[in-house]
Regions:
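Conserved AdoMet/S-adenosylmethionine-binding subsite of the radical SAM
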Residues: 7-185
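Alpha/beta-hydrolase active-site loop
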Residues: 1-5
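Radical SAM enzyme core and accessory elements
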Residues: 179, 189-210
Length: 210
């Protein structure tokens, strides 16, 4: 895992300021190796990257969230929410069959009670799927007073069923959350002009890579 960091670092000849464990495999299903890698990235005799610049993101493996909290790790934790209800999230993320929305939010509360640290909830906005005003209202009820940050992520389009929400819809969604009890931010991805944004990296034509 750390080799990936070093490979990129040596390729771009620039300082890498942040590391996020997510995608290309669920981090909490490779729990110990991910934690070991984060420790090496953070260690003063390793990469010496500040702990506050390292984030581990999970789709919501509840037993591992609890373990992570109890072990007292100092790296940020993020959960991919992506739905405003159990039925909706189940259609987007099959993991909801095993770990329900209510159980996931409770695990986020448990994480806060144990660690006293804010958690980030990630919410990818999908046109016509989870970007309605009613979704914003449900999120405010679902999340309630949980000490957290809701990170809204406009979808980066690739060939497939989902599409990016319009700028107008994104703005309306954000405005609806203006009076929520939690912080709301928007993550604008870079590299989308070359299909290199978050979630876009893929081999489009295998013939070109033989």
């Amino acid at each position: 895992i750390v080799d990936q960091y070093l490979l990129i670092l040596n390729s771009i000849n620039k300082r890498i300021t942040n590391v996020v464990f997510m995608g290309m495999g669920e981090p909490f299903l490779n729990y110990q190796q991910v934690v070991n890698a984060a420790n090496l990235l953070n260690h003063k005799e390793g990469i010496n990257l500040s702990a506050k610049r390292i984030t581990i993101s999970t789709v919501g493996i509840i037993p591992k969230i609890t373990q992570y909290a109890k072990e007292g790790h100092k790296y940020k934790l993020a959960i991919s929410l992506n739905g405003s209800s159990q039925d909706q999230r189940l259609k987007i993320m099959p993991i909801s069959k095993t770990h329900s929305m209510d159980a996931l939010i409770q695990s986020a509360w448990d994480y806060y009670y144990i660690s006293k640290k804010l958690i980030t909830l990630e919410y990818v906005l999908l046109a016509g799927v989870n970007d309605d005003i009613a979704d914003a209202d449900r999120l405010m009820v679902l999340i309630g007073d949980l000490p957290c940050k809701l990170n809204l992520i406009p979808y980066n389009e690739i060939d497939g069923l989902f599409h990016r929400s319009s700028e107008e819809k994104i703005e309306r969604f954000v405005n609806r959350l203006e009076h929520a009890n939690f912080t709301v931010t928007i993550r604008w991805s870079k590299g989308t002009d070359i299909s290199g944004g978050c979630g876009q990296l893929a081999v489009l034509d295998k013939e070109n890579y033989k």
